[in-house]
């Protein structure tokens, strides 16, 4: 349960500390004194976003098996969270608060009219939230797979439409019959052809000087070797030199043969063939504004695309099977959820009827209407809460429920959800008075024996029923207003009950005392 609540620099609240207790804690005050700011401060601690002033801080003491102090503050424009004085994440704080506080502010009334809120409330009551999350997961997977199939079929259609063109692109390149490596060789041959006479002259002259002509390198080496052979006997060094010269002769001869092989011998037919291929390649390069190697790479990609096209039927069948499997899984889960909703809807109607009777709506009934709808991530049900003050002529809440009826219905719906350790209600008694107000107070008093209840109210009976009472007041520091929250003594509580009854007089004070006594 909640213990101490400390609020600092929270809008008009400068420095307030409130100590809640077990039972029914009641906060009252004149209109405009910021009664709901206590709720807003707790919402701030629970992570509510907003434009909060620098230095804002809210600290809350949770009492249970162990004492936990949670804090959120704004420093340098950023929110910081703490658990027992140590820095913590927002998610850690929210996890610690989970199941501890059920906060029902005035704005929650509006949610009663929303179909998604009504659906979520029924699912929570029916303990279906986990199954609905699973359903949502399957639904999202189904939609994703359906989109994948749609995109696949669209691309398949595009491929089929341009298949002839793609095949032509491949054919016009393959008819040339040149690979990337062969293209480089072809360019080298073309370069050779363009410089054929120059190459022939250079090779011919080299062959002549190496071996074929007079005074060739080969001939000169032979003469040198023969001359040295004549004087070989005069020095051992000559034998070594003669051997080296002989080796040189052999190398020159090998060089001659190698060079002779490089003498270009290209037929006119081969020249024409090379020029024809280069001409066709040049036309392709001009046509596609790309180099031939780039065109070859693109053709390989086109081949891959065509290969994929040939296997699309298998892929399509595979995708359709996956879609059908997910659809069957979704349908099965959706049917289970729908069945459980319809079953639990009756229990919800009965439970709400019981609570409404305790709140002085003897003949009022809630009807949970469930109709089949188009599939959504929440299933195939359209859920709407219908209400009747007299047990017939059910209509949507916004059409028939008065403010007082809505307040009590909201209270009843809040209480059928999984129990929290602390319930916080803001103006839950709006629009009710007289005997009904007394019954609501009595109901909350009984509820507070099981769990802690904090309520902000204008109701005299609720104020009288409080185990601990607080009052908000507006003060001024010069021209600057600020809000204080102070605990009321027993005497002050009676005076506050009298004020809420309409006026302070001996008669109302006496009535206030009797009302307070009625709840003891």
From Swiss-Prot:
It holds the Pfam family AAA_23. One of its GO terms (biological process) is double-strand break repair. ATP binds at residues 29-36. NCBIfam families: recN. This is DNA repair protein RecN. The lineage of its organism: Bacteria, Pseudomonadati, Aquificota, Aquificia, Aquificales. Belongs to the RecN family. Keywords: ATP-binding, DNA damage, DNA repair, Nucleotide-binding. May be involved in recombinational repair of damaged DNA. GO terms for cellular component: bacterial nucleoid. GO terms for molecular function: ATP binding; ATP hydrolysis activity. The gene is recN.
